[in-house]
């Protein structure tokens, strides 16, 4: 028979053991509630589990197109130290207020998201790369939940942001003289596809089985990548959902160049040599608001800043 003091000591020991067990259980749960850290060429990235899908969000696939990189082809992303937090989406690209998207003036927006089904085996899964729509003026990858698709298709799904509006499609004479593409948003998409080709295997995807798909402007983008020599070898299958190349004939190269020069003048940058440097110094919000639709619409959709045949990205 134990004494009251002994019984009290035993109760304390029991509570201690139960507490330790709870801590161990919580630690084990924490370990399985997050997907493994992935080591990319840029650095390590963590993610989160969403309904049984591994999600790695807000991964930069190109350098921020700001300052001197505004209206330049996408450049490689910088490396980072430590582990990057991949639990939240990156910023949406600069765009005016629309029925679907809030206004944004953020140019540091070249991010992608990777979704992979939990419980993958050793075999690599096919890859699907999603290009959002929005008339090349609005939208973002964050508007689409790819968790269910990754599970049902048993595929690694990637969704991407790309430059929009006058940040993604314009024809400035000084850029034309430098043989810079007028289709920077399309080049962003190509940069994302190159990232997929070199990095997606680390997330369990098969870089030799990439399907490019999109809707509306995203579908038109898919069509253009099917004919662009710069996109050759970056994907292997394509799905187009409501949107085709012929939608882009609304803005001929000459008209695009004229409206780009006009945009510069609206920003206080005189036509001629030096206009490009002046335009690069203007705040993103000013560029965006001076380039919003002004009666230049087809069936209610602005077609002012869409891809054009520049002989570089679009033949």
Enumerate the predicted regions with their spans.
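Alpha/beta-hydrolase active-site loop
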Residues: 109, 179-201, 258
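Alpha/beta-hydrolase fold nucleophile elbow
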Residues: 204-215
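Short glycine-enriched nucleophile-adjacent loop
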Residues: 219-230
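Alpha/beta-hydrolase-fold catalytic nucleophile elbow
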Residues: 161, 213, 228, 239-242
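N-terminal secretory signal peptides that target proteins for export/translocation
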Residues: 1-9
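Substrate-access "cap/lid" subdomains that shape
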Residues: 98, 198, 232, 241-315
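Bacterial N-terminal signal peptides
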Residues: 13-23
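Non-catalytic accessory segments of hydrolases
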Residues: 28-186, 207, 301
